[in-house]
């Protein structure tokens, strides 16, 4: 029986120092029914030189200016032909056996298949495991979101819509809240899918994302009080994390997550 077609989309911009590791980690899966798509935001470094070295391995390569991460994600969806789609961006590394694990778990009955993701501290090398949330309430405190571990069906994107270009950073949380509210079904796949380095575009200064967080709670059915509660919960979480890390840079992660390494 032929395995399902899986689309992997790598979004990149000036990622010459990291993208080759991402590409190699995907290609080394040796998955027989892979649709690999590259969406580049008109990089000015050697990103495209690296991409072109593997050009025959990709189904689609797009290199042009975009309107932000959400716009790039939507381009990736539009250019994908797989039954499920995962975004494995240019700071991420797919772990061995990931695609086989998803193919084995796929049953055609769910909209979103969520695997585990390892978070790596690039300063210390410490890794911890993030187990995904499969329920996203109006105020999504304690919800874990890592698009590197999410395989979303093309049908789900067609039904629930793509990524809101009004959201600059937590666009994956916005999508999951919207999809959950509209009845999306989730399946947890207990397998380590990918590793990503903490400190990337969507894991930096919480204050830059205030407008986004207030917006997505309100648009997904919350009121102003709930929106501000969620935002200041995140602010307080960051504050507590900094305090705990006085006892060691990885101390807060050790308390929050199951150990991986």
Indicate residue ranges for each PLM-predicted region:
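N-proximal low-complexity "stem/linker" segments adjacent to membrane-targeting elements
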Residues: 1-28
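Acidic helix N-cap motif at the loop->helix transition within catalytic regions
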Residues: 17-20, 45-53, 93, 97
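Cell-envelope/extracellular polymer assembly enzymes that use nucleotide-activated donors
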Residues: 4-7, 35, 174
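A conserved acidic beta->alpha catalytic loop
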Residues: 32, 40-49, 89-92
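Short aromatic/hydrophobic "clamp" motif used to bind/position activated sugar donors
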Residues: 85
């Amino acid at each position: 029986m032929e395995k399902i077609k899986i689309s992997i989309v790598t979004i990149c911009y000036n990622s010459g120092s990291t993208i080759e590791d991402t590409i190699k980690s995907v290609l080394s899966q040796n998955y027989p029914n892979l649709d690999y798509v590259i969406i580049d935001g008109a990089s000015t470094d050697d990103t495209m030189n690296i991409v072109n070295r593997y050009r025959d391995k990709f189904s689609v390569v797009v290199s042009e200016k975009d309107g932000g991460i959400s716009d790039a994600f939507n381009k990736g969806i539009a250019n994908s032909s797989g039954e499920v789609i995962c975004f494995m961006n240019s700071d991420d590394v797919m772990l061995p056996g990931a695609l086989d694990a998803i193919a084995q778990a796929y049953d055609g009955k769910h909209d979103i298949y969520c695997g585990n993701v390892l978070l790596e501290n690039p300063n210390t090398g410490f890794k911890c495991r993030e187990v995904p949330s499969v329920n996203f309430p109006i105020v999504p405190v304690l919800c874990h979101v890592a698009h590197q571990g999410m395989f979303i069906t093309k049908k789900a994107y067609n039904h629930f819509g793509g990524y809101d270009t009004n959201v600059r950073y937590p666009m994956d949380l916005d999508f999951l809240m919207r999809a959950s509210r509209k009845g999306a079904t989730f399946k947890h796949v207990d397998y380590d899918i990918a590793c990503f380095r903490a400190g990337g575009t969507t894991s930096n200064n919480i204050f830059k994302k205030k407008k986004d967080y207030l917006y997505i709670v309100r648009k997904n059915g919350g009121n102003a009080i709930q929106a501000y509660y969620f935002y200041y919960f995140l602010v307080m979480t960051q504050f507590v994390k900094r305090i705990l890390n006085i006892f060691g840079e990885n101390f807060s992660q050790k308390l929050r997550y199951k150990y991986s390494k």
